[in-house]
């Protein structure tokens, strides 16, 4: 069964439509990359799929409408990493990651051994184990981003939605993050990740969905979506798309003089 399915989904802000109508699916064990220029509607779409923004049309999770799910039930099924990643409280990094286990615990209960193992694995994937005792407010922005990503991974949900999680990370940690998403997918979890790095998207995602002005401009395998023609049309850039090491590499080299 398709895990997450949106049909004729629309989102309006201030009475004006900003997303849709569009349709989108997410299968078990799949990493889907969400592409598009600034203002294309990526963040708004992810919020709607997380059940955090009112929407028209339909959006279902394993056949159940998102609108019919309680916040508690949704938190057991969907984890959401927003684009804003400022940590506003002085808590140890390990405690921050442990917050991802809240949906699975009774109020006031201690972490179980299973909880601790899941937290430790999430911290390992995001390379924040050495920061466990550091205050989250006293580490770098990139380290904060990785700690918050570890918290979302520790939520251990079938669906993970991540809004530009690689932004601000060094190249090694960008690759490590995408590799972590792939490892989650290999275990049957489903990931939608919005990205501006086209090479990361093309190399690590099973499918790509390109948005433009709130609608789907293209969808398919990376080689079908990341093309010079589409990049010119949607992003307004000239780009060289080549194959390096058996995977696509994308290099924007100038402005195309198109609509952007």
Predicted regions and their residues:
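Conserved ABC ATPase "signature" C-loop
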Residues: 213-214, 220
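ABC ATPase nucleotide-binding domains
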Residues: 232-260
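Conserved ABC ATPase signature
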Residues: 110, 135-139, 143
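The feature captures the beta-strand-to-loop junction immediately N-terminal to the Walker
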Residues: 35-37
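Conserved ABC transporter NBD signature motif
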Residues: 57-65, 74
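Catalytic Walker B motif of ABC-type/P-loop ATPase nucleotide-binding domains
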Residues: 160-164
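Conserved ABC ATPase "signature" region
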Residues: 98, 113-131
